[in-house]
Amino acid sequence: MPLTAESAAQQIQDRLKDIQQNIHNVDEERRRAENSIASLVRSLHATNQKVKPLLKASLTEAAQEEATIRAALAKIHEIRSIRNERRIQARNAGNKEAIRRGALMKMVQLSAQTLPLFVGKLGERAPALCGAIPAEGNYVAKVGDNVAALAKGIDEEENWILAEVVQFLHRQNKYDVIDIDEEQKDRHVLSKRKVIPLPLMRANPETDGHALFPKDTVVMALYPQTTCFYKAIVHRLPQTATEDYEVLFEDSSYTNGYAEPLPVAQRYVIAYRPTKKGAGSGSGNLSSA
């Protein structure tokens, strides 16, 4: 059943109210936890019999605070899903509004900034499609997901472009994708090996450094203010959850073959996959980009 604008707005409003209540609950739970921790610190030199109940209470309150925060994050994810569903319906109905180039670039940047941060539980490893961790072999990107797609342009050259999944054709094992660039509006039917799902979560360098590309790794990265991926080398890793990579894009106009470092968000830095020609746009040279 189609999701109407009114229904979507109401569902989002309901979830925003839930989030507001979650935030209020987190504040209360944090105050209780701080009081319990203060009592625990004051009792550190007391007998185990007195310390154990305080320690147990502190752990329980911390777990409750974590659960409330995760509940709020789940509501935020639901809101993102509702908005995405409405956007897909509008596109399929032919009601998609034209987006100017500047607005598109801002949307691309905002999509990276608001990508959910993976916050694992104790001992939990970052999953597939978190940071640099690739999708599993049998994974199929969902309708509306952004991907890197190796598609032919007007000049018949293949380039890695930022695209959106329209559908997955199971019988053909191919993706139907649309160029994210409004000026192109091209649709492509591509084999699965020519489509790379983008990360669905950011990795926190402070807790999940293994989910980031190491320094000097050859990658593909979205060149700033464009919708194309090019070959690059990781120059500097993010140090915090909000920082970007710094990468060196190939550029034959420089004596060492690489341009100056540029920031690229985790969402748009993916494993390098060479094309048949092994050079040029989508696999590297930016001298004419």
UniProtKB/Swiss-Prot annotation:
Gene Ontology MF terms: methylated histone binding
Broad class of where this protein is predominantly found: nucleus
Compartment annotation: Nucleus
GO cellular-component term (any): H3 histone acetyltransferase complex
Signal peptide span: none
Record-linked InterPro entries: SGF29, SGF29_tudor-like_dom, Tudor_SGF29_rpt1, Tudor_SGF29_rpt2
Domain notes from UniProt: The SGF29 tudor-like domain mediates binding to methylated 'Lys-4' of histone H3 (H3K4me).
Protein name per UniProt: SAGA-associated factor 29kDa
Gene designation: Sgf29
